[in-house]
Amino acid sequence: MEYPNIRSLREDHDFRQCDLASVLHVSQNTYSQYENGVIALTAERLVKLADFYNVSIDYLLGRTDNPEVNRN
């Protein structure tokens, strides 16, 4: 599965892959595989990333260009 925005979010915030790997409690190699679409993120890890960046899961999945979380 592809996650078109997780690499750009990481780079925009000047994080390294190992920084995000630590947040998700995975290896840097595993995180790299997420960014490259080799393996799928679990729902729990998608939520962690969305909360970490304060963006919607739909934004992480590339289903919207709007990163804002709809809290209605």
Segments (PLM) and residue ranges:
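DNA major-groove recognition helix of helix-turn-helix/homeodomain DNA-binding modules
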Residues: 25, 44-59
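Short, charged recognition helix plus adjacent turn
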Residues: 12, 61-72
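DNA major-groove recognition helix of helix-turn-helix
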Residues: 35, 53, 61-64
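Short basic helix-loop element that most often maps to the first helix and adjoining turn
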Residues: 4-23, 48
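Recognition helix of helix-turn-helix/homeodomain-like DNA-binding domains
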Residues: 25-40
